[in-house]
Amino acid sequence: MSHEKVKELQVSALENGTVIDHITFGSVLFVIKILNLENVEDPIYFGANLKSVKYGKKGLIKVSNRYFRPDEINKIALVSPSATLIEIKDFEIVKKSRVEIPDDVKDIVKCFNPKCITNVEDVPTRFHVIDKVNLKLKCHYCEKITSKNIMEFR
């Protein structure tokens, strides 16, 4: 009996759904959380600290039977601007696109200013992205700047 080493473990291909690839190193679990994927019934496969020629290390999430809305794609872009979305139907790639940080972010991020109208009244948040490289958002109402390290999602 020969003892062959397993060189690669395969995860089932998606019949239908979305692959989020090239997730920023260390962000996979956060992406799962902000997309509320821990509460879906269909299978989800994810990998963290995967080797990447382009990025060194990356993360990957495969979500069965799910395609993301624009507001969800914006959340992914804010957390992982290098991410790629791959939509699968009948085991075939039907669409592949990179996420992009939008110019305006609506009702996704909380304003950290406790006196902002969005924290006092039932007003949806709205931010203007003033720096896409370092990710800085300016509140439309109180004009406070929110940076990536203090950003909270709604």
Which residues make up each language-model segment?
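Cys/His-clustered metal-coordination modules, chiefly Zn-binding fingers
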Residues: E92-R154
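Interaction interfaces in information-processing and related assembly proteins
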Residues: S2-S97
